[in-house]
A protein has these predicted regions:
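Short acidic, glycine-rich surface-loop motifs adjacent to enzyme active sites
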Residues: 1, 95-120
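Active-site glycine-centered loops adjacent to acidic/histidine catalytic or metal-binding residues
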Residues: 1-4, 28-29, 109, 148-149
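Extended active-site neighborhood of metal-dependent phosphoesterases/phosphodiesterases
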Residues: 6-100, 121-144, 155-190
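Short active-site segment of divalent metal-dependent hydrolases/proteases
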Residues: 31, 112, 152
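Short, well-ordered beta-to-alpha junction loops that form the rim of enzyme active sites
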Residues: 69, 107-111, 149-150, 203-204
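A short hydrophobic beta-strand element
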Residues: 106-108, 165-166, 200
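A short C-terminal boundary segment appended to hydrolase-like catalytic domains
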Residues: 189-205
Length: 205
């Protein structure tokens, strides 16, 4: 949201309030507070401004789920892609109220899975290590995972009912250039939902 500068949260809130449209946020690695002794400390500031780090809502025939999969591991700026048990228990209960004919979106910062050639490092920071449990809970739904974190665009079809859309960071190559590492221009993803049908596109900015 503000690139490792939580003191800017009030200014950010003032700015987006003028848009007069609902804004839903998913916490990312640059939104955490580092230096504490536990994972729970890492999201307290974000949560105090924006509410729970995982939640869900319904719009039309779609059910939207926002998760936190940035797990702080008690070292300065060290985290892994991981969904904790508390979140899984909540998600399991949440989905128990969602009919199978509902379109489901799962929004989280770190991708659920990446091809090996697309990973930046071997620290499990670029994909979610326990993602198989998430896929299991989504079985039977027409589900789309929307993730960020990387600086490239890729769509992955896991099977006939599960797809992931990984959208490049709006900063491109870390604000050094107006392109992402895959050569696409800086921009954002747009998803159009009509009943159970989803169309998506990428818009340069």
């Amino acid at each position: 949201v503000v690139g490792d500068t939580p003191s800017l949260y009030p200014s950010y809130i003032d700015t987006v309030s003028s848009l007069e449209i609902p804004i839903y946020r998913a916490i990312g690695n640059h939104d955490m507070t580092y230096g504490g002794r536990t994972f729970e400390y890492s999201y307290r500031t974000f949560e105090s401004y924006f509410g729970p780090i995982y939640y869900s809502l319904n719009k039309g025939n779609a059910h939207y789920i926002v998760l936190d999969n940035c797990f702080y591991v008690n070292r300065d700026y060290q985290y892994i892609g991981y969904i904790d048990e508390r979140t899984f228990q909540w998600l399991e209960k949440d989905l128990s109220y969602v009919p199978k004919d509902k379109l489901v979106f799962v929004v989280m910062h770190i991708p659920s899975s990446l091809q090996k050639k697309l990973r930046y490092n071997t620290l499990d920071q670029d994909e979610t290590v326990n993602t198989a449990a998430l896929y299991k809970l989504l079985e039977g739904y027409n589900a789309h995972i929307i993730s960020g974190h990387t600086h490239f665009n890729v769509n992955v079809c896991f099977n006939d009912s599960l797809m992931e859309h990984n959208t490049a960071a709006v900063c491109g190559t870390w604000w050094r250039a107006d392109i992402n590492v895959d050569g696409t221009p800086r921009g954002y993803g747009v998803y159009e939902v009509d009943g159970n049908q989803v169309k998506w596109l990428y818009k340069s900015a």
